[in-house]
């Protein structure tokens, strides 16, 4: 989970028009325009687990609406989520951090320790402050990545496997960058690192924290993180 800017997209106004009409008529908010706009805003990935390879995505209410029309049809309360995380979250974690207004990855550290087997572990740790929203978000992240039922645990293993492969690829780019023999080769790999550290990348929070946790070794690579998300801006 990282901060995602809720930017205007080609379908944003169409989505908001659909939501207004749906609110007036009592119809569903689940329209094609709303789905398209949310997919674009959230870069096609689940806002909770950051997986981009899920087979099913849904519209989720950050604040459960419980029949409240304003919350039900509020564009700013609608988020793009995979079916796995949506089913786990439901209305059980309240409040959680709003990733469109709060710098989640600067409030929570995202770490993967160990390797294959029992030593591998995902950790979500408050960076400085610790409040109810942060604690609830950490509970949600743990349940999303590890599952809460036998079926959800199986789904979570697939997400962790996807995360492992993605991080392994990222680490390989880092190694190639550090071992590059000339500037041309380094520039080519730099383009890959920039792509992997963008908001649109899968599992971005883990990749950024890999750099922040290893400043002596990887400090040079922070220049590839978008300017508005650099560590120094948040004093962590």
Language-model features: where?
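Bulky hydrophobic/aromatic packing residues
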Residues: 31, 75, 203-206
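Residues that form or immediately flank small-molecule/cofactor binding pockets and catalytic motifs
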Residues: 9, 64, 113
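DNA major-groove recognition helix of helix-turn-helix/homeodomain DNA-binding modules
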Residues: 85
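Histidine-centered nuclease catalytic patch
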Residues: 48-80, 89-108
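Short, charged surface segments at domain edges that flank catalytic/cofactor-binding sites
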Residues: 1-45, 67-73, 168-175
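C-terminal, charged low-complexity interaction regions
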Residues: 139-236
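Domain-exit/linker segments immediately C-terminal to small folded modules
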Residues: 14-17, 89-183
């Amino acid at each position: 989970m990282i901060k995602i800017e809720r930017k205007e997209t080609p379908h944003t106004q169409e989505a908001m028009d659909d939501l207004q009409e749906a609110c007036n008529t009592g119809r569903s908010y689940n329209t094609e325009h709303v789905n398209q706009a949310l997919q674009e805003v959230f870069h096609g990935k689940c806002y909770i687990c950051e997986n981009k390879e899920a087979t099913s995505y849904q519209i989720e209410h950050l604040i459960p609406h419980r029949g409240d029309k304003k919350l039900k049809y509020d564009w700013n309360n609608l988020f793009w989520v995979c079916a796995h995380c949506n089913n786990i979250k439901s209305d059980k974690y309240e409040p959680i951090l709003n990733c469109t207004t709060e710098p989640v990855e600067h409030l929570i550290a995202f770490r993967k320790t160990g390797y294959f087997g029992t030593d591998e572990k995902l950790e979500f740790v408050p960076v400085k402050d610790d409040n109810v929203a942060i604690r609830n978000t950490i509970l949600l992240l743990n349940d999303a990545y590890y599952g809460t039922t036998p079926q959800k645990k199986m789904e979570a293993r697939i997400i962790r496997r996807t995360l492992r492969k993605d991080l392994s690829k990222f680490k390989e780019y880092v190694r190639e960058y550090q071992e590059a023999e000339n500037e041309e080769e380094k520039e080519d790999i730099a383009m890959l690192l920039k792509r992997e550290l963008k908001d649109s990348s899968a599992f971005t929070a883990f990749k950024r924290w890999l750099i922040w946790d290893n400043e002596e070794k990887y400090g040079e690579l922070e220049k590839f993180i978008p300017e508005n998300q650099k560590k120094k801006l948040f004093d962590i």
